[in-house]
């Protein structure tokens, strides 16, 4: 067995498999997109079987491109889109319904009903999360209530619930391991993050039988071995973390006060708060950053639902660009005298507003507004929303002032224009790492360190390397005008909702 580590990165729009060598360098990559299903307005689903097929095919592709065999892989790490819900038959392994995706808003009315009963404080206290359709618990309640016979079958122990990681572990191990990790469990509205256990009161409120819940393990732990018939070897699965927590690890944000922001379909900023569960007074989430050797490290998180998705909208909806990388150069050519604001509330607004009913809007258009101004507005919207998150975080986390350097990753950060504008609007330095695949790298480190073939935490943190630091160049007067315009646009969007 070699020192190679395989990272499975199961995302919202595609699945990636990445093989890292013993020096933490990428040896081979496989990637495959899958279909998004929109049965009704505000509903988003995935076919779990299609996701499973993309995992198998991308793993095989990555191994082949690496020029190795499955026997050379020391361990597998799995990272995944969080909150997305799958329920399957314990005997056959077949899903009873499409997966309900984290973006799905169908349970908004149910969340409001629970809030009116005064239950949000209970959920916040125990889970660190708000009562929002974003999280798994109300989606699971919907499945049990709307799929014929599901509630009764779940109570009999005939059904399994899991986030995507759990479903993949089950499939990869041939049903031998029914488990998840603490980071994914912490996103379900069912897990008590102080006690590190499924919560009896919350499962009762959401009518979720505990018989269908997986075992919760540390992020670096034994999650079984792959069925040899899949890839030609029984490979141990030794690391699991939700995508944003995996990125936090991949960015080596191990010390309290360190901060990262990932720009994929959405944008997610996490601030390491160490052993302290910092309770936000600014509508941020208190969540588990990682759990290693039985010790939990917590984080503050801000979630934005639309980041890269706004660029996809430019490409697929407005058709003003042919490919996502074109956005930065198009934005750069925009007329500086035009201040156009896009509030991309396509599926509601996330932190710190948490308004599922808000809808997207564009402000400031004139007869001369064109594709370049739309492109700039889409990219700037991501920057403005990041600033909103970081301002809320600094109010909750006052220990080190506001001099934090933001570490960034994800597909959007390859754009120099976007990162410079982010630094300008934050009025803070932004660090882009050499390795942009930080989500996969983070979970690869979990698996590799557990397998004993990758360095310990301290050495791994020292190996983090910066590609470029972006420093703010925008003058204060310009920044104030732009921020005032953004806040006005958001306010009008919320009023319209």
Swiss-Prot record:
Pathway of action: Polyol metabolism; glycerol degradation via glycerol kinase pathway; sn-glycerol 3-phosphate from glycerol: step 1/1
The Enzyme Commission number assigned here is 2.7.1.30
Q: Name one GO cellular component term.
A: cytosol
What's its catalytic activity?
Answer: glycerol + ATP = sn-glycerol 3-phosphate + ADP + H(+)
* Record: residues binding ADP: 12, 16, 265, 308, 411
Give the enzyme's main class according to its UniProt record, as a single word: transferase
Q: How is this protein's activity controlled?
A: Inhibited by fructose 1,6-bisphosphate (FBP).
Locate the residues binding ATP.
12-14, 265, 308, 312, 411
In which residues is glycerol bound? 82-83, 134, 243-244
Residues the entry annotates as binding sn-glycerol 3-phosphate: 12, 82-83, 134, 243
One of this protein's GO BP terms?
glycerol-3-phosphate metabolic process
Functional summary from the UniProt entry: Key enzyme in the regulation of glycerol uptake and metabolism. Catalyzes the phosphorylation of glycerol to yield sn-glycerol 3-phosphate.
Query: By its UniProt entry, which PANTHER family does this protein fall under?
Result: GLYCEROL KINASE, SUGAR KINASE
What family is it from?
Answer: Belongs to the FGGY kinase family.
Please give the name of this protein. Answer: Glycerol kinase
């Amino acid at each position: 067995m070699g020192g190679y580590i395989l990272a499975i990165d199961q995302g919202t729009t595609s699945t990636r498999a990445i093989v890292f060598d013993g020096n933490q360098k990428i040896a081979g990559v496989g990637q495959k997109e899958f279909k998004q299903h929109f049965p009704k307005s505000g509903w988003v689903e995935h076919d779990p079987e299609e996701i499973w097929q993309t995992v198998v095919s991308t793993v095989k592709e990555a191994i082949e491109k690496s020029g190795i065999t499955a026997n050379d892989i020391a361990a597998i790490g799995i990272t995944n889109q969080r909150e997305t819900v799958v329920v399957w038959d314990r005997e056959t392994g077949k899903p009873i319904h499409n997966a309900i995706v984290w973006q799905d808003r169908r349970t908004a009315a149910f969340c409001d009903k629970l809030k009116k009963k005064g239950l949000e404080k209970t959920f916040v206290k125990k889970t660190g999360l708000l009562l929002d359709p974003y999280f798994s618990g109300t989606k699971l309640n919907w499945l049990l209530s709307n799929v014929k016979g599901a509630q009764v079958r779940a109570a009999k122990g005939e059904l399994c619930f899991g986030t995507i990681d759990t479903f993949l572990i089950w499939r990869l191990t041939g049903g031998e391991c029914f488990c998840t990790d603490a980071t994914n469990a912490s996103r379900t509205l069912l897990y008590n993050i102080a006690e590190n256990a499924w919560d009896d009161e919350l499962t009762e409120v959401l009518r979720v039988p505990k018989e269908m819940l997986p075992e919760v393990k540390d992020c670096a732990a034994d999650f079984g071995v792959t069925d040899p018939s899949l890839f030609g070897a029984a490979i141990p699965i030794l690391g699991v973390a939700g995508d944003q927590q995996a990125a936090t690890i991949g960015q080596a944000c191990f010390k309290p006060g360190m901060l990262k922001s990932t720009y994929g379909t959405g944008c997610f900023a996490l601030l390491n708060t160490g052993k302290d569960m910092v309770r936000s007074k600014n509508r941020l989430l208190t969540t588990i950053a990682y759990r290693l050797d039985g010790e939990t490290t917590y984080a503050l998180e801000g979630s934005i639902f639309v980041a890269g998705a706004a660029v996809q909208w430019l490409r697929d909806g407005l058709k003003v660009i042919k490919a996502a990388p074109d956005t930065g150069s198009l934005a750069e050519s925009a007329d500086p005298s035009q201040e156009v604001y896009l509030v991309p509330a396509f599926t509601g607004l996330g932190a710190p507003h948490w308004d599922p009913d808000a809808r997207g809007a564009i402000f400031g258009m004139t007869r001369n507004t064109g594709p370049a101004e739309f492109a700039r507005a889409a990219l700037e919207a991501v920057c403005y929303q990041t600033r909103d998150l970081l301002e809320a975080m600094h109010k909750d986390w006052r220990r080190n002032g506001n001099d934090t350097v933001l570490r960034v990753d994800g597909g959007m950060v390859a754009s120099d224009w976007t990162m410079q504008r982010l630094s300008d609007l934050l009025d803070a330095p932004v660090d882009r790492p050499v390795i942009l695949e930080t989500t996969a790298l983070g979970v690869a480190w979990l698996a590799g360190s557990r397998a004993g073939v990758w360095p310990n935490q301290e050495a791994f943190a020292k190996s983090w390397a910066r590609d470029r630091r972006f420093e703010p160049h925008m003058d204060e007067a310009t920044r104030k005008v732009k921020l005032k315009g953004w806040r006005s646009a958001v306010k009008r969007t919320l009023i319209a909702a």
